[in-house]
Amino acid sequence: ISDKKLSTIILGPDFPTGGELIYNDSLNEVYQKGRGSIIIRGVIKSEEINLGKGKHKRNALIISELPYQISKAGWIEKLAELVNIGKIDGISDIRDESDRDGMRIMIELKKDSNPEIIISNLYKKTSLQSNFGAIFLALVDGKPVQLTLRKYLNYFLEFREETIKKRTNYFLRIASEKFAILEG
């Protein structure tokens, strides 16, 4: 199987806090060289919210996932600070509406603000988009070695094969001992 085909099967790392990977040549570099940087960004949806009876609808941005190792509370605090000093314009309110069903940060926009411009500013001026350094490092014969994805998978398969052989030999030895006892 070719490296290109391998990269279509293994799409990228899965981070526990979610976020979406920006696929470009950097991920292929990580796969082929064993080291590189991956761009990950938070997930933003735009929706219209109703402010109350008789009031106009407004646009809001809903953030449902943050990049790995970004603190939600710290990110909201930093965003509020940027809005207060005027570095990000067009935001009227920021609310954390997270509950047991998942994360939800609602950013209410001002009446005539453009959601696309604000999304662009959020990615540029906050940690909503960040680079994550990746290195495929493994112990091979007791020494740390930087591996490509193909070598990494080959060593993993060798390890699994060895583990299964050891487990099978153990069960065979136990069964042989029981058989010897029963046979007398």
Tell where the protein language model's regions lie, with residue ranges.
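C-terminal interaction appendages of subunits in large macromolecular complexes
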Residues: 1-184
